[in-house]
Amino acid sequence: MELSEIRNLLEGYSEKINGFRDSLDLDRLEEEIALLENDMAQPEFWNDQAAAQKVIDESNALKAKYDNYQAMNTMLEEAQTMLEMLQEEADEDMQVELEEMTTALGQKIESYELEIMLNQPYDHMNAVLEIHPGSGGTESQDWGSMLMRMYTRWGEAHGFKVEILDYQDGDVAGLKSVAIRFVGRNAYGFLRGEKGVHRLVRISPFDSANRRHTSFTSVDVMPELDDSIEVEVRDADVKMDTFRSGGAGGQNVNKVSTGVRLTHVPTGIVVQSTMDRTQYGNRDKAMAMLKSKLYQLEMDKKQAEVDELRGDQSEISWGSQIRSYVFMPYQLVKDTRTGYETGQISNVMDGEIDGFINAYLRWNL
């Protein structure tokens, strides 16, 4: 990397970091952190543990924003100093170090930009992602299992705790439905753009004639509400069914009815949880999912988008697709909203979907 190229990069990074400073309002940010720390120092702080944890989480998030900004600013100053020294006297080792620092700074800035883009009210929350194959039988159900693998790999690679809440086996292969919980800060913010219909084009391994098939699978994403948001659900409005349940692939089938299915009669929303060992645990998880769906339903009504959040999307077909995954006759994954695309389809199916997530966040600003 030439020094002139490094200089141009650092000038661009400097503009971005100055923009971060303006958007963050550092003085106000420092005041907010100080106020929260003062609250945490009070003797009665832990009297309400749920409220205390919320304050701690907010404080940690603000500190992370502040510390990350300061770290980027320090890196920029060090890089600028090294550049000045190299312009006066060449030093091969120092130039290699500067190139590495410039690359690392660019990566930090990109990550920080994403953090700033996660500015919706529920972006910081955990997420529940549901996969529902459309019509197409085994081929569509196998596509659902491929998406499940893609998302779980993405979550694990990014340090999220990934938990299967409910899993229903496909008739021959794949799955009929799955609900996956992602635990970690900003899980919903990163995943909310994955909601929609995902289209697969490939030569089906289940077709003896080796014909090309097109399959559709619906992905739904909702925030997992915390205790700060109350959703009232009347007992009279909920029908509960219990059934025997087992893990993915038919493992550990229970001899008692631990699986729980909840139906919200007024809206027709159905949720279920099967992966906990107890009926009580599955009921709690199913109720949390139901509350999230009801809350999101109300939010979508205000935005005139209620049809997208009634448990199952109305039609899993061409019209509502957000992304196409083409294996044959060529290899390409393309997002129909942002235009972002890649030919590295194997990497995408292994969970490398950051490019699509980042492109959506920028597109949706």
Curated annotation (Swiss-Prot):
Residue ranges of the TM segments: none
Pfam families membership: PCRF, RF-1
Native species: Lactococcus lactis subsp. cremoris (strain MG1363)
Maturation and modification: Methylated by PrmC. Methylation increases the termination efficiency of RF2.
Gene coding for it: prfB
Protein name (Swiss-Prot/TrEMBL): Peptide chain release factor 2
UniProt GO MF annotations: translation release factor activity, codon specific
Modification N5-methylglutamine occurs at: 251
Subcellular locations according to the entry: Cytoplasm
Disulfide bridge positions per record: none
HAMAP family in alphabetical order: Rel_fac_2 (MF_00094)
GO cellular component: a single term: cytoplasm
Biological role stated in the UniProt entry: Peptide chain release factor 2 directs the termination of translation in response to the peptide chain termination codons UGA and UAA.
InterPro entries linked to this entry: PCRF, Pep_chain_release_fac_I, Pep_chain_release_fac_I_sf, PrfB
Signal peptide location: none
Similarity-based family: Belongs to the prokaryotic/mitochondrial release factor family.
Keywords on record: Cytoplasm, Methylation, Protein biosynthesis
